[in-house]
Swiss-Prot record:
The gene is astB. Gene3D superfamilies: Succinylarginine dihydrolase (3.75.10.20). The lineage of its organism: Bacteria, Pseudomonadati, Pseudomonadota, Gammaproteobacteria, Enterobacterales. The keyword 4Fe-4S does not apply. InterPro entries: AstB_sf, SuccinylArg_d-Hdrlase_AstB. It comes from Salmonella paratyphi B (strain ATCC BAA-1250 / SPB7). This is N-succinylarginine dihydrolase. Signal peptide: none annotated. It comes from the Bacteria. One of its GO terms (biological process) is arginine catabolic process to glutamate. Its EC number is 3.5.3.23.
Amino acid sequence: MTAHEVNFDGLVGLTHHYAGLSFGNEASTRHRFQMSNPRLAVKQGLLKMKALADAGFPQAVIPPHERPFIPALRQLGFTGSDEQILDKVARQAPRWLSSVSSASPMWVANAATVCPSADALDGKVHLTVANLNNKFHRALEVPVTEALLRAIFRDESQFSVHSALPQVALLGDEGAANHNRLGGEYGSAGVQLFVYGREEENEIRPARYPARQSREASEAVARLNQVNPQQVIFAQQNPEVIDQGVFHNDVIAVSNRQVLFCHEAAFARQKVLINQLRTRVDGFMAIEVPAGEVSVSDAVATYLFNSQLLSRDDGSMLLVLPRECQDHAGVWRYLNKLVAEDNPISAMQVFDLRESMANGGGPACLRLRVVLTEEERRAVNPAVMMNDALFTALNAWADRYYRDRLTAADLADPLLLREGREALDVLTRLLDLGSVYPFQQTGAADG
């Protein structure tokens, strides 16, 4: 059956700021406390979405979350009105205020793991929400992510959205950022590659930074998503590269159809994995980048592998890259050589995503890939699909509500909370989502 990959990109939230919340993510740590520009950030993301949609790649949006998230502060023991709580936490525990104000939901590669209908035992599209339990600010995302996905993929005859795994360390799950799908045509059965950093009875794990994804979680997600057991491979990420800042597999590898583009040091038993894939995937091609041409540290600094690999109508592939790759002489030299060689990657497109990149999120972090047949695509909430009208509306919305500068001190401003809630109220109507946010369900917008 004919199917296409649709990229659902996360909209950057109104409280996008640099707090260094993500240990193991070196860009996040390096840019801590710098001033951010939320309006520029959301527009950089919108420009990427629109450019790719105009080039013929189906594109949709996933909204941001309510931030600052007052219910989480109430759970932590802060009391009073919303304004009183903001004042208390800013004075007593500013780190918590930063955590509950994180715009990290924009990196929707961590929202869920997706199984196309061609791979599922029941013939449905499955999405399992990631629990993101390695980081407090990310674990907060889970309930609203589930509500948003149910509002977008609302036809239960076509889609099954599964709740996240239990919030325990053993079942740490980071979603599609640790998942690749390889195969031929999108509508044909493929091989799903689940990548983990640790497993309970395996002492091979990183020493410096945490391995966020467990094998136990990957296996559970594969079961929930009803992936045909004959179409699954579980592989361990190289713990040495996790210790160099590769906190998700999509920082060191990206796949599309029959191609796996990765660093030569990406996986723990890479030769074995490559041979497995060669056996299981017709026409499989591994493009392994040697350390002599691009070091792991340069790959992390430029997010070379946090790129999007997209299929064009002529069968060739487009590599969507952050500007940091172009700015790095060695990486750019390698890429120009790559597209000149005999392989499916024949073109590159560079985007300025520096607001997101400074927090450790490149093009691939910002999107959730969902393979859909034409019938399934018609069943998706049509209001989230990118087109000229939505692009214009979202830019006007951003101009109205987003600030052009934000520091950690601004997070305590009650006006920011009110601006955010008003903006999300408008957005849910624009995207026909219903009342997906807690403040809409409880009347908290009134104070």
